[in-house]
Amino acid sequence: MNEFLNEAKAGAKAWLVKAGTSLAVILLVVIGARVYSSSKSAESVIDNPTEEAITFKLDGKDYTLEPKTSQVIKLSKGEHTLEYLGETTKFTKKAPKFLDTDYSIINPTKSLYVLYNEIYGENLTETEADEKSSTYDCEDDQGKPDKCPRKFLSDVFIQESVDYGLDEATPDNVDVAKSTRYTIKKKLFRGDDFSKYMGADSEDVILEPVEVK
């Protein structure tokens, strides 16, 4: 009997050690992801998509950006001040949400950007794809309230949760769980890049999934 109890205790101890190790691994993964997310969220992209060089001040520091260029800087959360062409604008960078794919742009020229819901799905009709990806408020051709897969942005400071930033290409394929049949990835475009991406006659893009699980 004692031998049986000892074996049971040893087995329980081994299980606890294994469970503890698994929990520790999970915690390390979560913490690592959080640190990576916070590190990326601390960065902001100053972007100049125009044909002219621009000069401005951010929090009292002078910057010059050549045409069609950008610069990545560290920008802390809180209030900041931008001075451009005699106009002073104050904006606030929010703290990122837990494990959020936070992305921010400083847009001195107030140029147009587009946040687009790219849908990847299996056996989806164009109507289904449009309904599932249209999560942003917009207006239809008659000016009535509607839902669209894109959101237009032109603020001095843009902060959004995205999967792909300005210079990151969307993949041709992504993994899609069988239980959902589709997934949506958010991509942020410069206005001109979005027009080229969509094409003159296209309204939406439906991409094929890979390794449907």
Residue ranges of model-derived segments:
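Extracellular Ig-like/FN3 beta-sandwich strand-entry sites
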Residues: 77-79
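Short loop/turn and low-complexity linker motifs enriched in small/turn-promoting residues
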Residues: 2-22, 28-67, 74, 85, ...
